[in-house]
């Protein structure tokens, strides 16, 4: 049986938390801020947590993180 390999594209985007979840940078933050409200820009500052539905699926893809 071959070794499980980590998906490298996903590994660059997600970090595993101590509780077993995954966090990533927010989308929609690279350009075109003039079309976004102050509230939107403020809320996009932090990192986003992956929802629990996707954590099981990504746990296999990112098994070695």
Curated annotation (Swiss-Prot):
Superkingdom of source: Bacteria
Q: Name one GO molecular function term.
A: structural constituent of ribosome
**Gene3D superfamilies recorded:** 4.10.410.60
Task: Check the record and name the InterPro entries matching this protein.
Answer: Ribosomal_bL35, Ribosomal_bL35-like, Ribosomal_bL35_CS, Ribosomal_bL35_sf
May I ask which residue range the UniProt record assigns to the signal sequence? none
Give GO cellular component annotations, separated by semicolons.
cytosolic large ribosomal subunit
GO biological process annotation, one example: translation
Alphabetized, the UniProt keywords read: Ribonucleoprotein, Ribosomal protein
Q: Pfam families from the xrefs?
A: Ribosomal_L35p (PF01632)
Q: Where is this region: Disordered?
A: 1-26
NCBIfam families for this protein: rpmI_bact (TIGR00001)
The similarity comment for this entry is: Belongs to the bacterial ribosomal protein bL35 family.
Protein name listed in UniProt: Large ribosomal subunit protein bL35
Q: Which organism is it from?
A: Oenococcus oeni (strain ATCC BAA-331 / PSU-1)
């Amino acid at each position: 049986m071959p070794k499980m390999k980590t998906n490298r594209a996903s590994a660059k985007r997600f970090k595993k938390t101590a509780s077993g979840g995954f966090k990533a940078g927010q989308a929609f933050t690279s350009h075109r801020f003039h079309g976004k409200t102050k509230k939107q820009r403020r809320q996009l500052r932090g990192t986003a947590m992956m929802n629990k539905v996707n954590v099981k699926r990504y746990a296999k893809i990112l098994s070695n993180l």
